[in-house]
């Protein structure tokens, strides 16, 4: 049973601290910390994609405040694999925290190097590539790894031996015994379990899905069938990070005597990096530039593109809008959607499919009758298998929303793990591991989300987002008042409204607001005394705002963003 920490019971004991900067009670921005005495190691540093209501925001990363405050303790960052929700925050971390070394698998290391090169103010000290056989030590920690099967090659779980017990972080994983390729290293997991795993931090993304997930082998078979039977061009979209599937699709295309055209920056980048480090063996003669596809018969072309999530600027959406410079859709085209919409993208994907349908193209989506996508995350029986292999003393669910975390607690109980030994945490909540036992410490670090806009990150963006959300819902109302040097109001205040209500249809209300503002301001100037000019301006703005707010709420039931401009001539 996980108990509350009582300091009086552990005088002179130094705990191993376990906490999440992000990734708990959410899907995205995975980042976890393990601390002992004067050392902190970090596992992953990801980004979370912004929902539609976060207007103008490109992504969300964890707060690095705790690491900035404890800079001297930071010893290393360990990356489990190269997906954005695990590496997307790295350049922003390196702008604020001096990380001595980053340990990462091959493809993740290459992707990180490229990302950092795009952020000139990010300081990268050293990147060390690790594999299945790597071992690293700091003063207090011993770290090694086990390979997992995921939707990107070179994916790993991380094992950390600490003075108070052993911690395993699962990474993203699944079991796929049929597809071949990189298998989850069951033998290594068993060896790690023999050490006694005190805390298992396990991903929960697909914890609500029963059974075993579909094998990629079935996905390849179905894609091959569609490509083989297509009489025109095939346009296939999938996640650009799903390197394993992309490699297989290219092989299928070549076997069906089709040239492959890569469209979309992330698709092009990921394939080129994979070829460079030897994860893909592709003959350059099988790849064609988009400007050259017109020189080939339609049935000899497969376009592999971005846009599976309905992204506005992605290649497939550009085609659907008829705006692509080189590709115009035809009724003879076959579109394959080898993906599922991630939460928040359903509407965008449906809009994309509707636009594509207007061209009369043939569209294949992932469905129970035609499996074209398999998740890279463990479902219920796979989680049971992993829990039985590791059989930890304590379980901390990560990488999932609360309901997913709650579900894996039930799964763990079926595997013989006591429900009281499962810690359902929040980001920032610190657990103490002492002599192999886990405690709720009561300590909390800052884990506020930090918003990214045009590669800039700042806590202040939260206020900007709130203003944008008010603007989108309630509109804006501006008051402009001009005074002479004796503080007399010149003329009447000017009112401007945008997105709040139509001013021409509300002339009596606008007149009432104008006169009320003028009377209120004159009353302030005539009857109040101020020590400073700043105090007077603050009071004048307050009167303007409260007057506008009162009348608009009373008459329109709106609460717009109110801006006041006062000037003296």
UniProtKB/Swiss-Prot annotation:
<protein>
    <recommendedName>
        <fullName>Ribonuclease J</fullName>
        <ecNumber>3.1.-.-</ecNumber>
    </recommendedName>
</protein>
<keyword id="KW-0378">Hydrolase</keyword>
<comment type="function">
    <text>An RNase that has 5'-3' exonuclease and possibly endoonuclease activity. Involved in maturation of rRNA and in some organisms also mRNA maturation and/or decay.</text>
</comment>
<dbReference type="InterPro" id="IPR042173">
    <property type="entry name" value="RNase_J_2"/>
</dbReference>
<dbReference type="InterPro" id="IPR055132">
    <property type="entry name" value="RNase_J_b_CASP"/>
</dbReference>
<feature type="binding site">
    <location>
        <position position="172"/>
    </location>
    <ligand>
        <name>Zn(2+) 2</name>
    </ligand>
</feature>
<keyword id="KW-0694">RNA-binding</keyword>
<feature type="binding site">
    <location>
        <position position="150"/>
    </location>
    <ligand>
        <name>Zn(2+) 1</name>
    </ligand>
</feature>
<feature type="binding site">
    <location>
        <position position="399"/>
    </location>
    <ligand>
        <name>Zn(2+) 2</name>
    </ligand>
</feature>
<dbReference type="InterPro" id="IPR001587">
    <property type="entry name" value="RNase_J_CS"/>
</dbReference>
<dbReference type="Pfam" id="PF22505">
    <property type="entry name" value="RNase_J_b_CASP"/>
</dbReference>
<dbReference type="Pfam" id="PF00753">
    <property type="entry name" value="Lactamase_B"/>
</dbReference>
<keyword id="KW-0269">Exonuclease</keyword>
<keyword id="KW-0963">Cytoplasm</keyword>
<feature type="binding site">
    <location>
        <position position="85"/>
    </location>
    <ligand>
        <name>Zn(2+) 2</name>
    </ligand>
</feature>
<dbReference type="InterPro" id="IPR030854">
    <property type="entry name" value="RNase_J_bac"/>
</dbReference>
<keyword id="KW-0479">Metal-binding</keyword>
<feature type="binding site">
    <location>
        <position position="81"/>
    </location>
    <ligand>
        <name>Zn(2+) 1</name>
    </ligand>
</feature>
<comment type="subunit">
    <text>Homodimer, may be a subunit of the RNA degradosome.</text>
</comment>
<dbReference type="GO" id="GO:0004521">
    <property type="term" value="F:RNA endonuclease activity"/>
</dbReference>
<feature type="binding site">
    <location>
        <position position="83"/>
    </location>
    <ligand>
        <name>Zn(2+) 1</name>
    </ligand>
</feature>
<dbReference type="GO" id="GO:0003723">
    <property type="term" value="F:RNA binding"/>
</dbReference>
<dbReference type="Pfam" id="PF07521">
    <property type="entry name" value="RMMBL"/>
</dbReference>
<comment type="similarity">
    <text>Belongs to the metallo-beta-lactamase superfamily. RNA-metabolizing metallo-beta-lactamase-like family. Bacterial RNase J subfamily.</text>
</comment>
<keyword id="KW-0698">rRNA processing</keyword>
<dbReference type="InterPro" id="IPR041636">
    <property type="entry name" value="RNase_J_C"/>
</dbReference>
<dbReference type="InterPro" id="IPR004613">
    <property type="entry name" value="RNase_J"/>
</dbReference>
<dbReference type="Pfam" id="PF17770">
    <property type="entry name" value="RNase_J_C"/>
</dbReference>
<keyword id="KW-0540">Nuclease</keyword>
<keyword id="KW-0862">Zinc</keyword>
<dbReference type="GO" id="GO:0005737">
    <property type="term" value="C:cytoplasm"/>
</dbReference>
<keyword id="KW-0255">Endonuclease</keyword>
<dbReference type="InterPro" id="IPR011108">
    <property type="entry name" value="RMMBL"/>
</dbReference>
<dbReference type="GO" id="GO:0006364">
    <property type="term" value="P:rRNA processing"/>
</dbReference>
<feature type="binding site">
    <location>
        <position position="86"/>
    </location>
    <ligand>
        <name>Zn(2+) 2</name>
    </ligand>
</feature>
<dbReference type="InterPro" id="IPR036866">
    <property type="entry name" value="RibonucZ/Hydroxyglut_hydro"/>
</dbReference>
<feature type="binding site">
    <location>
        <begin position="373"/>
        <end position="377"/>
    </location>
    <ligand>
        <name>substrate</name>
    </ligand>
</feature>
<dbReference type="GO" id="GO:0004534">
    <property type="term" value="F:5'-3' RNA exonuclease activity"/>
</dbReference>
<dbReference type="InterPro" id="IPR001279">
    <property type="entry name" value="Metallo-B-lactamas"/>
</dbReference>
<feature type="binding site">
    <location>
        <position position="172"/>
    </location>
    <ligand>
        <name>Zn(2+) 1</name>
    </ligand>
</feature>
<dbReference type="GO" id="GO:0008270">
    <property type="term" value="F:zinc ion binding"/>
</dbReference>
């Amino acid at each position: 049973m996980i108990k509350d920490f009582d300091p009086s019971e552990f005088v002179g004991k130094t705990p191993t601290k376990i906490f999440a900067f992000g990734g708990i009670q959410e899907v995205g921005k995975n980042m976890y910390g393990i601390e002992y005495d004067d050392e902190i190691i970090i596992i992953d540093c990801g980004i979370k994609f912004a929902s539609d209501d976060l207007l103008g925001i490109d992504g969300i990363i964890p707060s690095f405040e705790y690491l900035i405050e404890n800079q001297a303790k930071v010893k290393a960052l360990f990356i489990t694999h190269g997906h954005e929700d695990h590496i997307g925050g790295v350049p922003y971390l390196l702008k604020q925290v001096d990380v001595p070394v980053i340990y990462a698998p091959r493809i993740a290391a290459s992707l990180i190097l490229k990302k950092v090169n795009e952020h000139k103010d990010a300081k990268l000290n050293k990147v060390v590539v690790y594999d299945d056989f790597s071992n690293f030590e700091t003063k207090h920690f011993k770290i090694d790894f086990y390979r997992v099967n995921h939707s990107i090659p070179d994916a790993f779980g991380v094992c950390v031996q600490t003075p108070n017990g052993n911690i395993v972080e699962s990474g993203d994983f699944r079991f796929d015994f049929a597809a071949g390729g990189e298998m989850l290293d069951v033998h290594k997991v068993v060896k790690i379990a023999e050490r006694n795993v005190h805390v298992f931090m396990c991903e929960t993304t697909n914890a609500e899905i029963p059974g075993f997930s579909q094998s990629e082998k079935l996905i390849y078979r179905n894609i091959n069938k569609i490509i083989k039977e297509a009489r025109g061009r095939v346009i296939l979209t999938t996640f650009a990070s799903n390197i394993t599937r992309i490699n297989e699709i290219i092989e299928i295309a070549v076997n069906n005597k089709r040239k492959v055209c890569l469209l979309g920056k992330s698709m092009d980048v990921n394939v080129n990096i994979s070829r460079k480090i030897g994860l893909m063996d592709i003959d350059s003669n099988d790849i064609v530039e988009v400007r050259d596809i017109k020189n080939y018969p339609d049935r000899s072309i497969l376009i592999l593109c971005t846009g599976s999530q309905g992204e506005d600027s992605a290649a497939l959406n550009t085609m659907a809008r008829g705006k692509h410079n080189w590709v115009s859709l035809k009724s003879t085209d076959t579109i394959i959607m080898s993906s599922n919409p991630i939460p928040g993208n359903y509407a965008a994907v449906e809009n994309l499919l509707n636009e594509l349908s207007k061209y009369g193209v043939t569209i294949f989506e992932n469905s129970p009758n035609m499996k074209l996508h398999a998740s890279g995350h463990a479902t219920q029986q796979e989680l049971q298998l992993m829990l039985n292999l590791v059989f930890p003393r304590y379980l901390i669910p990560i990488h999932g929303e609360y309901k997913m975390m709650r579900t894996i607690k039930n799964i763990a109980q079926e595997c013989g793990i006591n429900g009281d030994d499962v810690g359902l945490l929040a980001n920032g909540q610190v657990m103490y591991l002492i002599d192999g036992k886990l405690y709720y410490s009561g300590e909390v670090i800052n884990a506020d989300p930090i918003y990214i806009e045009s590669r800039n990150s700042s806590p202040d963006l939260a206020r900007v987002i709130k203003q944008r959300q008010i603007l989108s819902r309630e509109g804006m109302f501006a008051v402009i008042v001009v005074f002479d040097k004796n503080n007399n109001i010149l003329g009447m205040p000017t009112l401007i409204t945008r997105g709040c209500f139509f001013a021409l249809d509300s002339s009596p209300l606008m007149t009432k607001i104008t006169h009320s503002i003028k009377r209120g301001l004159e009353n302030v100037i005539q009857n109040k005394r101020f020590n400073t000019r700043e105090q007077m301006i603050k009071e004048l703005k307050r009167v303007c705002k409260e007057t506008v707010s009162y009348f608009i709420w009373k008459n329109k039931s709106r609460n717009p963003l109110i801006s006041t401009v006062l000037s003296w001539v």
